[in-house]
Amino acid sequence: MNIGILILATNTYLPLGMRLVSRFHHFYKGNANIKFYFCSNQNPIAYLKDEIDVKFIFNMHESWLEGTNSKFKNLLSLENEDLDYIYYMDADTNVLQEFDEEWMLGDTVGAQHFNDQDLQKDEKAYDRNPKSKAYIPFDTELPQMYYHGAFFGGKKSNLLEMCQTMQEWQDQDQLIPYEPAVNDESYINAYFHYNPPAKVLPYSDFKFWPSDGGGIPSKRNPQSTSYLTKEIIKNKDKLWDIQDNRVTYE
């Protein structure tokens, strides 16, 4: 079984993406062939253990928004890769425990957002602009769950079909022009609202730790992180993390 993991890690997210690949590889105890697709303005391969299977996909983004809006396009670029499943993971996701692939396999897979039954218990953060392709009305009669934009995937053909639809939605909204309330996450929620995922990963059972920026200040603003990458390349064979804006070791 071949599983592809696509990570967007341009600019300040570069060391966080390296951390995700390194720690995913360390804690993964399954039997699938895992290949990482690392979308960035800098090649990460020299900073990672030699045995990790990584393909570098050059991306240049002038802003966080430009980066996050390239998500579907980058996933669609994997069409000719020899993969059975494809998953997207945010670069600032951390891995803190052992896991295998079984818990996340499904035809289409969505992850419940950690705010779904907390801050969004009574009202979801859906896009409410009727002109947008991400629109979900307040009076929808369909079941409501708010999904993460930080993690989704499924069988290759299903994931590519989903991304093709969302890319078309995004392109049409940009002609208005309109940017949905929560960017690409708004399209993901609209898609899953009308096409529920075959498998939902409850937040209580989620194996990863999303939105862990490692204490890097203003991570959405492009800035140099060479003070981190210099440490990473010297210690790439260790189990390392980023906490309090510095590289730490376990």
Annotate the PLM regions.
Residues 71-120:
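GT-A fold catalytic core of metal-dependent nucleotide-sugar glycosyltransferases
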Residues 1-67, 80-82, 234, 249-250:
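N-terminal anchoring/stem segment of glycosyltransferases
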Residues 68, 72, 92-93, 181-188:
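Conserved glycosyltransferase catalytic-site signature
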Residues 6, 37, 55, 87-89, ...:
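Hydrophobic/aromatic beta-strand patches that form the interior of the parallel beta-sheet core
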Residues 102-161:
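PAPS-dependent sulfotransferase catalytic domain
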Residues 138-243:
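Catalytic core and acceptor-binding pocket of nucleotide-sugar-dependent glycosyltransferases
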Residues 17, 47-48, 97-100, 163:
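Short glycine-/acidic-enriched loop or helix-start segments at secondary-structure transitions
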Residues 38-46, 92-98, 204-206:
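Short, polar loop motifs at secondary-structure junctions
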